[in-house]
Curated annotation (Swiss-Prot):
GO CC field: cytoplasm
SUPFAM superfamilies named among the record's database cross-references: Class I glutamine amidotransferase-like (SSF52317)
Protein name: Imidazole glycerol phosphate synthase subunit HisH
Species name: Aquifex aeolicus (strain VF5)
Keywords: Amino-acid biosynthesis, Cytoplasm, Glutamine amidotransferase, Histidine biosynthesis, Hydrolase, Lyase
Amino acid sequence: MRTVVIDYGMGNLRSVSKALEAVGFPEVVVSNDYRVASEADVLVLPGVGAFGDAMKNLEELNLVSVIRRHIEKGKPFLGICLGLQLLFEKSYEHGEHRGLGILKGEVILLPLGVKIPHIGWNQLWFKKESEILEGLKEGDFVYFVHSYRVVPEDESVVLTKTDYGEYFVSSIELDNVVAFQFHPEKSQKKGLKLLENFKRKAEKLTT
């Protein structure tokens, strides 16, 4: 099972790849080559930074169609932080920008009246049962760094929510796609458990 962490110039990917290796992903490659990404069994899209810049970089690297095709084929996909937001149709971060459009919905600023960006530990509240959440309990803490939140059209994709001024979507799951607004690689044991659970799901999808 070959896992490719997509490097599109948005953030330090070493901690993500090391966390994946730590939970037993057998072959983890960090690459910005669309040919390498197109042959992956598992794709991981991490990232921090601006939505518009991210989409521009993905397009210039010919990775947009690779990501869409990978997901359409039913192969395992993991999005982290900006990698969750990019799955949606559009974002209003510094203007209006089109996303990958895998999921219907948009990306908007966190609510007024809270400190932005949202940095630090916060709790997960479960919205549905999933193997991804095995070994975790309601109220467990994970680590966030973000200013924007996703608003899915279809609430059934929502895996967890988190309270920051009001409840926002902190993770989603739809078939072969799992994505976290928080950083599992920075969330210590709970984060590694989530990645381990994703690995188990990925193994089922690739055998």
